[in-house]
C-alpha cells in the first residue's frame, strides 16, 4: 500500500519523496485457535496491514483472503466475518455503553433477545455493568477501551483483528484484555493483533 505525502508530512518524515510505501510484499497465514501477532515499531505498517484486512482501505496491488473471502472483491462479506478494534476508534461521548451496544447490535441485525443476552455476558465479563448508563465522556481510558472491545466483538465473529489492544492501558486493564485474548484462542477464534510491546507477545 502506497500513500501520497503532503508537504507537511514530508517535512515530518524528513524526506523529499512524495510517496511512501507502507506495506510491500507481505504474506502470512493465521489459523483457527491461533493468536497471530504483528510486532514492530510505530510506522512499520502494522495498522495499514490490519486496516486492509478489515477492508477499511484497499490494497494497491494483490489481495487478502479472510475465511476464503477476498477483501478486494467481497469487502461487505468480509466485514460480516470479522471483529475489528482500531486504535483510532473514538466513541461518541454523549452516548452510554448500553446505547452504543444497542446501536451496533442493530447494525449487525442481531435478534433482540440474543443481543440482550450477549450484552449481559460481555458487560459482566469486562465489568461494565455499573457503567452501562454512564456517558462515555465520564468513563476512564481503560473503561472506554473495554467498551470498544465489547462493541467490536458483540456479533461473536470467528476472526478478531485488534490494533494495539493494550496501548495506553493501566496494568490491570491490560491484563483483562490479555486474558480475554487467550480466552478467544481457547474458543477456536482466529486473533490477529498488532503491538509494539514485546512483553505482550511473550504472554500470548
Describe every region a protein language model picked out.
Residues 149:
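Hydrophobic anchor residue at the start of the ABC signature
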Residues 102, 106, 113-131:
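Conserved ABC ATPase "signature" region
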Residues 135-139:
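Conserved ABC ATPase signature
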Residues 175-187:
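Helical segment within the ABC ATPase nucleotide-binding domain
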Residues 160-163:
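Catalytic Walker B motif of ABC-type/P-loop ATPase nucleotide-binding domains
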Residues 171-173:
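Helix N-cap at the start of a conserved alpha-helix in ABC-type nucleotide-binding domains
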